[in-house]
């Protein structure tokens, strides 16, 4: 009985997802987010007139800007 209980405990510990982190797209490749970063974002901004820049990656909160979208699942900001 102790062996069965010990086996169950080991399987439970191994199967737990300890320290899940979000994965977001960047302009070039993927980014593993920090544990506190709960969202992926894609945002278009204009640093110079008539030159839009696409920003993608992890973020701590969802921006409320007009040309910004955020989501909270892996690779959702493609």
UniProtKB/Swiss-Prot annotation:
* Residues of the site described as Important residue for inhibition of muscle alpha-1-beta-1-delta-epsilon (CHRNA1-CHRNB1-CHRND-CHRNE) and neuronal alpha-3-beta-2/CHRNA3-CHRNB2 nAChR: 28, 43, 51, 66
Gene Ontology terms: cellular component: extracellular region
Where is it expressed, tissue-wise? Expressed by the venom gland.
Where is the secretion signal located? 1-21
Domain of life here? Eukaryota
| Protein's UniProt keywords contain NAD | no
Q: What's one Pfam family here? A: Toxin_cobra-type
Q: Which cysteines are joined by disulfide bonds?
A: 24-40, 33-58, 62-70, 71-76
Localization per Swiss-Prot or TrEMBL: Secreted
Q: Which UniProt keywords apply?
A: Acetylcholine receptor inhibiting toxin, Disulfide bond, Ion channel impairing toxin, Neurotoxin, Postsynaptic neurotoxin, Secreted, Signal, Toxin
Q: Where is this site: Key residue for inhibition of muscle alpha-1-beta-1-delta-epsilon (CHRNA1-CHRNB1-CHRND-CHRNE) and important residue for inhibition of neuronal alpha-3-beta-2/CHRNA3-CHRNB2 nAChR?
A: 48
Q: Where is this site: Important residue for interaction with muscle alpha-1-beta-1-delta-epsilon (CHRNA1-CHRNB1-CHRND-CHRNE) and neuronal alpha-3-beta-2/CHRNA3-CHRNB2 nAChR?
A: 67
Q: In chain numbering, where does the site feature Key residue for inhibition of muscle alpha-1-beta-1-delta-epsilon (CHRNA1-CHRNB1-CHRND-CHRNE) nAChR fall?
A: 44
Q: Outline what the protein does.
A: This three-finger toxin binds and inhibits the nicotinic acetylcholine receptor (nAChR).
The entry assigns this protein to a family as follows: Belongs to the three-finger toxin family. Short-chain subfamily.
Can you name this protein?
Short neurotoxin OH-46
Per the UniProt record, the source organism is Ophiophagus hannah
């Amino acid at each position: 009985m102790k062996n069965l209980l010990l086996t169950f405990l080991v399987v439970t510990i191994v199967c737990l997802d300890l320290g899940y982190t979000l994965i977001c797209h960047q302009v070039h490749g993927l980014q593993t987010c920090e544990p506190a970063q709960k969202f992926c974002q894609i945002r278009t901004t204009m640093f110079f007139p008539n030159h839009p820049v696409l920003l993608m990656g992890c973020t701590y909160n969802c921006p409320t800007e007009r040309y910004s979208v955020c989501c909270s699942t892996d690779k959702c900001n493609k």
